[in-house]
A protein has these predicted regions:
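Mature catalytic domains of secreted/periplasmic carbohydrate-active enzymes
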Residues: 1-350
């Protein structure tokens, strides 16, 4: 499902706050080999990701409701030391028994309120020695490699990944009848993806599986639709230039009509057109470099355009196919494009 949806990596909740490990842990007997399905779910997850060419991330909760030192660690130093040794032993298992791992995704550094209390600097250095290429998120009370705004896409001036859940109300399983009114549509997922791509971030979209491990039906349809859209338009999403390279001159996230992503060499711009202009004509302003070609990304068809003396690109004959959700127009330049801020040159004219 993740591959079909166009995702490039997955993060598995290897152990959540209730302390249940989804692998054959020798440190924590409360695990999926001893209880429940009697399977090493982490192993199956890793094998499936490698088969499909997906990056591998491990979520690891710092808070643990089950461990006897999980609360005492905040005020008893001996309990703190025992608890930290326990957490590190768990993560050491994960980072030594399953080959190359790409992401360590900490969560909920409670009840201790400082990285010193968690001994995060030294522990993370030891874990990096096991996986030299791993990246670590910012939830061990250190900034580490990337930020993780949650529940709302908040742009950060660093590498970041928005952490969203599929229906906005539950991170675990919610029966389909209750979840359906809140389920994301393909359009809403694409809107989130656009906001992230426009602003140099990734989108991590949580889906709570059903009790049998399958994906709920209310998630399958929109994710499949997004995947099909990305098959044709993924060039506007994957590996695009971080907006900070333009030193703040580029508006972030679009203006309600369109959102922008652009190529690494600044020789192309991808215009995500949320609102189709009546009559099929739209003006894109503030561009001080003359384009050489405009195409519709999903079909490759050439779009008629005209570059005006007042630094506007007039796009003609724009149209939306049934079920297309949002068309993307690729504007190409012979040299890196120059753009002036929107407060001087209004950007989109319908």
């Amino acid at each position: 499902m993740a591959k079909a949806a166009g995702m490039k990596y997955m993060v598995l909740t290897t152990r959540h706050h209730e302390g249940f490990s989804l692998w054959d842990s020798k440190v924590n007997p409360f695990n999926s080999m001893n209880y429940g399905c009697h399977r090493d779910i982490v192993r199956e997850f890793v094998d499936a990701c490698r088969k499909e060419g997906l990056g591998i991330g491990f979520y690891s909760s710092l808070m643990d409701w089950r461990h006897p030192d999980g609360a005492r660690c905040a005020y008893d130093d001996q309990a703190r030391r025992r608890f930290l040794d326990y957490l590190e032993a768990l993560n050491t298992e994960l980072l030594t028994n399953y080959g190359k791992i790409d992401i360590l995704w900490y969560d909920v550094p409670q009840p201790m309120e400082s990285w010193e209390g968690w001994d995060s600097l030294a522990r993370n250095q030891r874990l990096r020695a096991l996986q030299p290429d791993i990246i670590i998120n910012d939830r061990s009370r250190l900034k580490e490699d990337f930020g993780t705004p949650e529940g709302k896409i908040r742009v950060m001036d660093r590498d970041w990944e928005a952490c969203m859940t599929f229906n906005d109300i539950a991170w675990g399983y919610l029966d389909e009848q209750q979840a359906l009114p809140y389920a994301y549509s393909a359009q809403r997922i694409l809107r989130m993806l656009n906001t992230c791509a426009c602003n140099g971030g990734n989108l991590l979209l949580n889906v709570g599986p059903k009790p049998d491990g399958s994906i709920p039906a209310d998630a399958i349809k929109p994710l499949t639709e997004v995947g099909k859209w990305l098959e044709k338009n993924g060039e506007a999403v994957y590996g695009q230039l971080h907006p900070n390279i333009l030193s703040g001159s580029w508006f972030r996230g679009g203006n309600g009509i369109s959102g922008i992503t652009y190529g690494k060499d600044l020789k192309c711009v991808y215009l995500w057109n949320w609102i189709s202009p009546e009559g099929g004509t739209m003006y894109y302003s503030g561009v001080f470099t003359e384009p050489v070609r405009v195409t519709k990304l999903s079909t490759g068809e050439d779009i008629e355009f005209r570059y005006t003396e007042d630094h506007r690109i007039e796009l003609k004959g724009l149209h939306v196919e049934e079920g297309e959700f949002v068309p993307v127009y690729k504007i190409e330049f012979a040299e890196p494009m120059e753009y002036k801020p929107f407060h001087k040159y209004p950007q989109i004219w319908l």
